[in-house]
Every structure is written in structure tokens, then in C-alpha cells.
């Protein structure tokens, strides 16, 4: 960093405060012609600060003077004479500041991550998507394993289920999506455990995605619209679920509600979505979900079509309903339901909302309630109910 100020300029330090420019010029003048003598003085007192700069016309003269005078005594004080250098602050100053920035990114990531995590549960709705997304992403991607695990387990633990159960309608809605995830999770938990182990990968994966998956998928669906894909994945999975659920159906029956919840979660979420969200994305989700659950084929349309959505809902719902029904009924129902779903959807949509409302549906009801949206919904639900009854 040290640079010569300019050739021929010497720094003279350690001067006696009494030494003045004339004395310096007299002492250093013998080495060569001096261009400038600059004695540094205090601004206020005008007293010498003990150092000066002497500039020689010839750099060679300056070197000689520095060599001879350095360490010599002048006016009773040993002086220091050397090539003058530019103040370090001028040359050196610019560099340092930059470093601090690095922190930002991590934070973001952190945020994202945390966020997603955070979102996952509660934010259900938006979060949900995110959650889903995240979950999805997380789950699906890296996290999938982990998150799902997280996801799955907690549900197992019962954390989520409570969510599911406790939160009933509204919360569900919020939870709903969250619920959904949880639900799915729950599923994991419920159905999951049993199946989960076997399915884990799939389930986790799916579920994760699926559980999350649901959300995820939902997310996906909503997000990706892979509804078809979701549908695909889901649909089967749902079926799996369905089976699973069915299998577990009894438990799931509880679950059904839950399962439904799950589904309802879907459905419900759906509903929620409906109510809370307005269902929009939920719908979408639902649609997806529906599409998913519901016949995949339908899925795609559902994905976005609002109407289809409803239909989807209905259908899917029915699907769900069907599933539900299936749940209620059994796997076979499942199939039937699948069929029924379809049929039911057709028939189910309108059927009996009242019925739909029935307790079983409470969840639904809640959902449906939430869902005032369409008879379809209620209907499907009813169907569900009906389906249930049917089955």
C-alpha cells in the first residue's frame, strides 16, 4: 500500500517543536536544491507538530540527505528522515467495506425453508399451497422423505389428526389445507402407518407429495396443474388411499370423516377452500384433488374448470364421496364408489344435500356447509352421505 509520494520528497519526523522551516532548509539545503519545505503545524496554535516534508529538486539529492540525516540530532532531537509516502488512508482506504453482504441469501433460504415449514401447517391456505408447494417441493424433492416423515409421523403422533379432528370445519379450512396436509398426513398416520410402512416410499412420496401430496399435489396441481399428473398419481393413489383408506376404511371411516376429511380434507379443504378460500385454489386443489380422487379423467378438466371443479368436486367429492362411501362401504365400494363416484357424481350431485349434511358429513357438512357452493357439493356430499347410506 505504501507508495512514494513523489521522488525527491522526504519525510522528516521527530523534530523539536522549536525547529522551523528556515532551520530545516539550512540543514537539508547542503544536500541539494530544495524545492519546498513544509513544516506541519497545529492549526490552532500554529506550533510545529514535530514533522515536516522537504522536497528536493533531484531525487538523488533526497536519497543522500535521507541516508545522512536519518537518526541525526537536530536542535537536540534525533530526527527520522525517509522517503515520503502517500498517506496510507488515501491509498488503502477504499478496500474493506464490501464483505458484510453475504448474509442475505441464507436468510432468504432460511426464510423460504422456514417459511415453507411454517406455512406448512397453519397457513394452510396460502401456506398450503406453498405448503404444498413447499411441501411438495420440500417433500417431494428433498424433503419429501424427511418432511413426509415429519409429516407422517406427526400425524401419527396424532398432532395432525387433532388438527384434523379438532379443527373441524373452519379450522380445517385453515387447517384444511393444512388439514389436508395433515389430513393426508393423518392418512398417513392412520392409514398410513399400516400402509405407510409398505407404501412409505410410495406413500410418503406420494403422500408426501401426496400427503403433502395432497397439499402438495394440490399445490402441484394447483401449481403445476399436473392435475392430470396429479390426477394420475393421485387418482391412483387416492385409490390407493381409497383402498388404503378403505382398507383402513373402518378406521378411516373415522378417518373417513377424516379420511373424508382427508379427502374432505380435500373435500373439506375443498370446501374450505370453498368457504375459506373461496375454494379457488382449493377448488383447484380440490379439483385436482377431485380430479385426483375422482376419476382421473375428470381430473384434468376439473383442474381448473370451476364448474368442473364443482363437478369435480362433486365428482371428486363424489369421488371422495364415493371414496368416502367407499370408505364407508368398503374397498369394493371403493370400486363401486369409483364407479359410483362417477355415477354418483352424476346422481350424487343433486341428491340430498340434507343428507349430505348428515353427521358423517358433518365434516363434510362443515365442508359442505362451508361449501354451500353447489348442490353439487352438498349433493355430492350427500351422495357421499347417500353413498354412504347406499353403501
Curated annotation (Swiss-Prot):
Species of origin: Homo sapiens
Domain notes: The RRM domain is necessary for RNA-binding, but not for splice site selection, indicating that its splicing activity does not require direct binding to RNA.
Modified residues (N-acetylmethionine): 1
PROSITE patterns the record matches: RRM
Connected disease: Intellectual developmental disorder, X-linked, syndromic, Shashi type: A disorder characterized by significantly below average general intellectual functioning associated with impairments in adaptive behavior and manifested during the developmental period. MRXS11 patients manifest moderate intellectual disability and craniofacial dysmorphism.
Linked residues for Glycyl lysine isopeptide (Lys-Gly) (interchain with G-Cter in SUMO2): 22, 80, 86
Record protein name field: RNA-binding motif protein, X chromosome
Omega-N-methylarginine modifications at: 125, 144, 164, 172
Record's subunit section: Homomultimer. Interacts with SAFB/SAFB1. Found in the supraspliceosome complex. Identified in the spliceosome C complex. Interacts with KHDRBS3. Forms a complex with ILF2, ILF3, YLPM1, KHDRBS1, NCOA5 and PPP1CA. Interacts with CLK2, KHDRBS2, SAFB, TRA2B and YTHDC1. Interacts with ERAP1; the interaction is RNA-independent. Interacts with PPIA/CYPA.
Positions bearing Phosphoserine: 88, 91, 165, 174, 261, 328-330, 332, 352
Gene3D superfamilies (UniProt xref): 3.30.70.330
Protein encoded by which gene: RBMX
Subcellular location: Nucleus
Main function: RNA-binding protein that plays several role in the regulation of pre- and post-transcriptional processes. Implicated in tissue-specific regulation of gene transcription and alternative splicing of several pre-mRNAs. Binds to and stimulates transcription from the tumor suppressor TXNIP gene promoter; may thus be involved in tumor suppression. When associated with SAFB, binds to and stimulates transcription from the SREBF1 promoter. Associates with nascent mRNAs transcribed by RNA polymerase II. Component of the supraspliceosome complex that regulates pre-mRNA alternative splice site selection.
Region (Necessary for RNA-binding): 333-391
Ranges annotated as biased composition (Gly residues): 109-120
SMART domains according to UniProt: RRM, RRM_1
Modification N6-acetyllysine occurs at: 30
InterPro entries per the UniProt record, alphabetical: Nucleotide-bd_a/b_plait_sf, RBD_domain_sf, RBM, RBM1CTR, RRM_dom, RRM_dom_euk
N-acetylvaline found at: 2
Tissue: Expressed strongly in oral keratinocytes, but only weakly detected in oral squamous cell carcinomas (at protein level).
Biased composition regions of type Basic and acidic residues, renumbered to the chain: 61-80, 194-215, 241-274, 338-347, 380-391
